Amino acid sequence: MSRFRRGGKAPDPLSGFRAPKEQEPAVPHGLIKAARKSGQLNLSARGLTDVPVSVWRINVDTPPEAHQNVDFGGSDRWWEQTDLTKLILASNKLQLLSEDISLLPALVVLDIHDNQIVSLPCAIKELTNLQKLNISHNKIKQLPKELQHLQNLKSLLLQHNQLEELPDSIGHLSILEELDVSNNCLRSISSSVGQLTGLVKFNLSSNKLTALPTEIGKMKNLKQLDCTSNLLENVPASVAGMESLEQLYLRQNKLTYLPELPFLTKLKELHVGNNQIQTLGPEHLQNLSSLSVLELRYNKLKVLPEEISLLNGLERLDLSNNDLGSLPCTLGSLPNLKSLQLEGNPLRGIRRDILNKGTQELLKYLKGRVQVPDVKTQEDENSTATAMTLPSESVVNTHAIVTLKTLEYCEKQASLIPEAVFNATGSSFITTVNFSKNQLTEVPARIVEMKDSVCDVNLGFNKISSISLNLCMLLKLTHIDMRNNVLTSLPSEMEAMTRLQSVILSFNRFKHFPDVLYRIPTLETILISSNQIGSIDPTQLIKMTKLSTLDLQNNDLLQIPPALGNCESLRALHLEGNPFRNPRAAILAKGTVAVLEYLRSRIPT
């Protein structure tokens, strides 16, 4: 019987003479070997607390295979190695870098981001070939002055550290193109940054800066400057000289006014939201010919200047959460504007349905109301005003007719539209007619002359008691405003207006909901508040699949039929000011979704 247990391993009789087994290296030898050939070594996310000496000495020490392979004809030519040019030590647990880093003078890229490094070694100055240095997401409080010797450095990433200042010597990095010091503790910036004339991208966001040095204006090649989330109260006038600037971020500061930027003709984006800016004048807008994005949200603007129309290239304008009570009509003339944000402003004088329809409908609305100095026609000059004809009645806005395709004769207190007004249109292709705020008792007969082109008619604030058949012949009409008249009914011939999308009938004398509206399936908006309507037919409203806004406020509705809750297309339903008991005011206050849900719950099953 063997003296060893079955299955057991016999002891090594030479074990006492063998050298102890070496601990497995933190960096596999295969990686080091491959790096000697490629010149690149990636040791990211390996849990390293120190960098192995073999990494620093990769191009100094003779590799182990040199002692094993003396065959000069072999394919593995260990003596033909490449200097290490790229070293990645990111996402480890490093706290310090050895001075032995000087043994890697050929490094072009050094990435040590996402560690716990508190300082850089003085030997960093030996890396004179370094072009990109990423030391972001560490715990560095101070940069060594030796950094100035990195004369080939193009990218320096220092974001998310604990820096309280930048050394004056940073100005010696003469060919630096990218500098990111965001998310640090900087309270000021050295004037020496003005020497970084090759800088293209400069990120100063999320610090504690109260001012920028005047010298920053010397950065003539800078394209992007980000100063978001600081404590800036003003911007130096020298910024206006940064003629290559394309993007300027000044969000979340304490600015009360904007600097004048007369020479920033290449500026494409200006972000100044979340400040305390109260005024915006023409001097801020002129010469910004390339601007495509202007962000002014969360400020205190009360007036938007008419000179906003100078920004012909503007594509996105964010004015949300300001104190704007009105908008300049010239805003409608911006040819490239695709997004206009206005939420949170106390806007008056613009219909809610227009605001709800989005940017393009709002711009169209504003464009149709551009006021241009009136020009008298020859017929007007030869006419003589009488006691029955107000002098203002002989004035025609010919500029609006020719350029805006708008025929406008409003606020004249006229009982008739002068023939000269219609004659002035000539062969122009009129799309908008505005005869509001007069004393008209009927729809002008000659309006039918524009039936092939007109799509928007405003006859609000008159004394019209009925809609003529002439108006029903405007088959291209998409919007009609008849508010504040004395209408009691609508003609059945309106059924032929198959392009009609919006109708405003508020403040008239309707006692019944006009049946003809049920038969116009294209309607999206019906505003018929402040009348005397006593009932509605939900079965007909359900068939109007495009109806999204229905305003029935201040009528005589004694009950709201539960079936109205099945109008799935409704996005805005206004019922306040009626004598019905249900839904209760508390439910109405919750909005359209809650009201429709309540009504559906009342449908008998």
From Swiss-Prot:
Disulfide-bonded cysteines: none
A Pfam cross-reference name: LRR_8
Each LRR repeat, start to end: 83-104, 106-127, 129-151, 152-173, 175-196, 198-219, 221-242, 244-265, 266-287, 290-311, 313-335, 336-357, 429-450, 453-475, 476-497, 499-520, 522-543, 546-567, 569-590
Swiss-Prot/TrEMBL keywords: Leucine-rich repeat, Repeat
Renumbered residue ranges of the record's region Disordered: 1-26
Family annotation (InterPro entries): Leu-rich_rpt, Leu-rich_rpt_typical-subtyp, LRR_dom_sf, LRR_domain-containing
The protein's name: Leucine-rich repeat-containing protein 40
